[in-house]
UniProtKB/Swiss-Prot annotation:
Record-given protein name: L-lactate dehydrogenase A chain
Keyword DNA-binding: no
Gene from which the chain derives: ldha
GO MF annotations, alphabetized: L-lactate dehydrogenase activity
One of the Pfam families matching this protein, by short name: Ldh_1_N
GO biological process: lactate metabolic process
Cited InterPro entries: L-lactate/malate_DH (IPR001557), L-lactate_DH (IPR011304), L-lactate_DH_AS (IPR018177), Lactate/malate_DH_C (IPR022383), Lactate/malate_DH_N (IPR001236), Lactate_DH/Glyco_Ohase_4_C (IPR015955), NAD(P)-bd_dom_sf (IPR036291)
Length: 331
């Protein structure tokens, strides 16, 4: 008799029970790992699967996380073969070429489309009912690409979009007012990145509209220069990349925030990238961020935001820019 047999007496053969809240992270770069750790520390899933083409890096990261199993409640698995991802509830795609210092998010496009042509069919093969969350940049275009390549209905393909931009925005407003970001309600919509749209008309604290107190807020004529806050949001990522070489922690936490709303069926409203054709005067098949309700089925509803004419025009301009790029893509 082995030590194990002397220690444990077997009662029954265990039936395999599938995890109802398995999460997969594709890509073990800086963003993938920050997302994985954030998901683990929030205790969101029973099983976390990780995939990447870089076999040694993947193996090392998985092993490193597994060494912390005692401190976690999640089973961690990893392999370059996508069978390890089978039956995931949410699949987070962070893989792709990384943005270089000074490189625009749009410049990354075709490089990442080619990577997606391999990744997406593999995800669909093993988790045909999952919710796909795209994080790789340029996120709005790649969410469209993932939607096209997956054949999934639109409510199951979500881009992380401006969830992080809005968090940065709320943080900076909070800094200016000496308040916690959760008490500063503010939304950034449209494209994730350089042409994102701050909805100044909706900025409020405890239901008090800041534009009601300062009608010039967000415009050139504003003596308090609130507009600079949005510029800081846009420049924020570039600044972090310049200083430490990449961004990771905040986007990782932002991803975990979205995954939580889905897995726990919270019906929370998040600014995420979805098909906006027919909204805010957008005519083309583009994905942009608008406030959306997230739950167990994915993206169930969209909130009708009251945008000013100028804001609406910016959203349409973003849509045109994105469509200009999308129609050139070889899918």
């Amino acid at each position: 008799m082995s030590t194990k047999e002397k220690l444990i007496s077997h009662v029954m053969k265990e039936e395999p029970v599938g995890s109802r809240n398995k999460v997969t992270v594709v890509g073990v770069g800086m963003v993938g790992m920050a997302s994985a750790v954030s998901i683990l520390l929030k205790d969101l899933c029973d099983e976390l699967a990780m995939v990447d083409v870089m076999e040694d890096k993947l193996k090392g990261e998985v092993m490193d996380l597994q060494h912390g199993s005692l401190f976690l409640k999640t089973k961690i698995v990893g392999d370059k073969d996508y069978s390890v991802t089978a039956n995931s509830k949410v699949v987070v795609v962070t893989a792709g070429a990384r943005q270089q210092e000074g490189e625009s998010r749009l410049n990354l496009v075709q490089r990442n489309v080619n990577i997606f042509k391999f990744i997406i069919p593999n995800i669909v093969k093993y988790s045909p009912n999952c919710i796909l969350m795209v994080v790789s940049n340029p996120v709005d275009i790649l969410t469209y690409v993932a939607w096209k390549l997956s054949g999934f209905p639109r409510h199951r393909v979500i881009g992380s979009g401006t969830n992080l931009d809005s968090a940065r925005f709320r943080h900076l407003i909070g800094e200016k007012l000496h308040l916690h970001p959760s008490s500063c309600h503010a939304w950034i919509v449209g494209e994730h990145g350089d042409s994102s749209v701050p909805v100044w008309s909706g900025v409020n604290v405890a239901g008090v509209s800041l534009q009601g107190l300062n009608p010039q807020m967000g415009t050139e004529g504003d003596g308090e220069n609130w507009k600079a806050i949005h510029k800081e949001v846009v420049d924020g990522a570039y600044e972090v990349i310049k200083l430490k070489g990449y961004t990771s922690w905040a986007i990782g936490m932002s991803v975990a925030d979205l995954v939580e709303s889905i897995i726990k069926n919270m019906h929370k409203v998040h600014p995420v990238s979805t098909l906006v054709q027919g909204m805010h005067g957008v005519k083309d098949e583009v994905f942009l961020s608008v406030p959306c309700v997230l739950g167990n089925s994915g993206l169930t509803d969209v909130i009708h935001m009251t945008l000013k004419a100028e804001e609406e025009k910016q959203v349409q301009k973003s849509a045109e820019t994105l469509w200009g790029v999308q129609k050139e893509l070889i899918l």
